């Protein structure tokens, strides 16, 4: 080995060799320092999550070699029991009880009060380190041994919990704070009730739209509208006005939504146009009175001329629960997902997903388009035929 080093020194020069070794030392020091800061880390080369280890030694830890050909030796690290170990259940392996003569030793050292307090009470209260005794533990990164306790009795007291207090650096576990809550089981019923309450609150947040009639919840307004149209609309049409009042709401959020809806389940309409800010008495763009068209989901209103409705479309929107462009959902699947695939009828303003149609479409057609409902109702007067005739 020495001959190889001498050959390299002769070939490159002594100063060059010293500079190279110094740079290598600096690189290794930076690499080790970086790894020690971010441990445990995921090794990008091997894909293995590296845990903390004790192979990094300082120059002050070096000792003379113990074997032939050994330049340095380093002190071995003290073995310590893992904190995950459980107390033995076998009575033969349990810790022996403290004898009366040991109690006398404890009283002399001031570890047990003279008023006869039991050892169990001493162990249940704060640890002895917190009562003024010095902490026997040394930092995990140091290589020093634990100092020997001043009496056998004190070591006997600390021995059952010693495996809990000696937290090894290799144990990166999430259950570290579990020791603090030992013996606190009074609020278990309150905690379970609080968890149920939190779960109901989270469900209300995930599904804020509730049905006023049956209390079923939905994540978005189009889903609730689809539920109204297919579940309760037929029942509401055949019932009287007194019988159509919704029952008691299931939650406070339902009560808030109930105040915003009419007896027929429709949202209370706004009395002004969202486009020109006029009302039914005057359209601020034309200066003429014009009735408002209101969304059945959000209650927003607009003049037909502001919405660019044709006379046929104006008559059609009065026959169903019309939705504004922000609340529009597919008339077939009832969802508002993939709104870029929605195709609107030029006769009734209903929306359809192009992939929900039969046959399905990949691209929107050129010119006007009429849905199957308007084709059956208007026949040759549908917009699609008017567009073909004009062309």
From Swiss-Prot:
Q: List modified residues, type Phosphothreonine.
A: 176
Gene Ontology annotations for the cellular component aspect, listed alphabetically: centrosome; chromatin; cytosol; intracellular membrane-bounded organelle; nBAF complex; nucleoplasm; nucleus; SWI/SNF complex
SUPFAM superfamilies given in the database record: beta-beta-alpha zinc fingers, FYVE/PHD zinc finger
Name a Pfam family for this protein.
PHD
Mutating residue 350 to H has which effect? In CSS7; abolishes interaction with acetylated histone H3; strongly decreased interaction with methylated histone H3
The UniProt entry's coiled-coil ranges are none
Cross-linked residues, Glycyl lysine isopeptide (Lys-Gly) (interchain with G-Cter in SUMO2) = 10, 99, 107-108, 178, 196, 281
Tissue expression as described in the entry:
Ubiquitous.
**This protein's UniProt keywords:** Acetylation, Apoptosis, Chromatin regulator, Cytoplasm, Disease variant, Intellectual disability, Isopeptide bond, Metal-binding, Nucleus, Phosphoprotein, Repeat, Transcription, Transcription regulation, Ubl conjugation, Zinc, Zinc-finger
Assembly and binders = Interacts with the nucleosomes, in particular nucleosomes bearing histone H3 crotonylated at 'Lys-14' (H3K14cr) for which DPF2 has high affinity. Also interacts (via PHD-type zinc finger domains) with histone H3 butyrylated at 'Lys-14' (H3K14bu), histone H3 propionylated at 'Lys-14' (H3K14pr), and histone H3 acetylated at 'Lys-14' (H3K14ac). Interacts with histone H3 acetylated at 'Lys-9' (H3K9ac), histone H3 di-methylated at 'Lys-9' (H3K9me2), and histone H3 tri-methylated at 'Lys-9' (H3K9me3). Interacts with histone H4 acetylated at 'Lys-12' (H4K12ac).
Q: What does this protein do?
A: Plays an active role in transcriptional regulation by binding modified histones H3 and H4. Is a negative regulator of myeloid differentiation of hematopoietic progenitor cells. Might also have a role in the development and maturation of lymphoid cells. Involved in the regulation of non-canonical NF-kappa-B pathway.
Query: Disease linkage in the record?
Result: Coffin-Siris syndrome 7: A form of Coffin-Siris syndrome, a congenital multiple malformation syndrome with broad phenotypic and genetic variability. Cardinal features are intellectual disability, coarse facial features, hypertrichosis, and hypoplastic or absent fifth digit nails or phalanges. Additional features include malformations of the cardiac, gastrointestinal, genitourinary, and/or central nervous systems. Sucking/feeding difficulties, poor growth, ophthalmologic abnormalities, hearing impairment, and spinal anomalies are common findings.
What is this protein called in UniProt?
Zinc finger protein ubi-d4
What organism, scientifically named, is this protein from? Homo sapiens
């Amino acid at each position: 080995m020495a001959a190889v080093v001498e050959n390299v020194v002769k070939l490159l020069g002594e100063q060059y060799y010293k500079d190279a070794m110094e740079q290598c030392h600096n690189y290794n020091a930076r690499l080790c320092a970086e790894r020690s800061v971010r441990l445990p880390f995921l090794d990008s080369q091997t894909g293995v999550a590296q845990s903390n280890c004790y192979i990094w030694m300082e120059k002050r830890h070096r000792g003379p070699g113990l074997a032939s050909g050994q330049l340095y030796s380093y002190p071995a690290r003290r073995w310590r029991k893992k904190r995950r170990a459980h107390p033995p259940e076998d009575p033969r392996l349990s810790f022996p009880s403290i004898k009366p003569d040991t109690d006398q030793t404890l009283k002399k050292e001031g570890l047990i009060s003279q008023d006869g307090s039991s050892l169990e009470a001493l162990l249940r209260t704060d640890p002895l380190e917190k009562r003024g005794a010095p902490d026997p533990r040394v930092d995990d990164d140091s290589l020093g041994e634990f100092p020997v306790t001043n009496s056998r009795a004190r070591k006997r007291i600390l021995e059952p919990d010693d495996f809990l207090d000696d937290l090894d650096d290799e144990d990166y576990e999430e259950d570290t704070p579990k020791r603090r809550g030992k013996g606190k089981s009074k609020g278990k019923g309150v905690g379970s009730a609080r968890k149920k309450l939190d779960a109901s609150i989270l469900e209300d947040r995930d599904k804020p739209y509730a049905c006023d009639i049956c209390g079923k919840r939905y994540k978005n307004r189009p889903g609730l509208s689809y539920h109204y149209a297919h579940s309760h609309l037929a029942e509401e049409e055949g019932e009287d006005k007194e019988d159509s009042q919704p029952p008691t709401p299931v939650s406070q959020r339902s009560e808030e939504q109930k105040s915003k809806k009419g007896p027929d389940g429709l949202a209370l309409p706004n009395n002004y146009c969202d486009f020109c800010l006029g009302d039914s008495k005057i359209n601020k763009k034309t200066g003429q009175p014009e009735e408002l068209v209101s969304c059945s989901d959000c209650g927003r209103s607009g003049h037909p001329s502001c919405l660019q409705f044709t006379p046929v479309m104006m008559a059609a929107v009065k026959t169903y629960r019309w939705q504004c462009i922000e609340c529009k959902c597919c008339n077939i699947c009832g969802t508002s997902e993939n709104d870029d695939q929605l195709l609107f009828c030029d006769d009734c303003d209903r929306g359809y997903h192009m992939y929900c149609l039969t046959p399905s479409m990949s691209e929107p057609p050129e010119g006007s388009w009429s849905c199957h409902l308007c084709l059956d109702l208007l026949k040759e007067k549908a917009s699609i035929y008017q567009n073909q005739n004009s062309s």
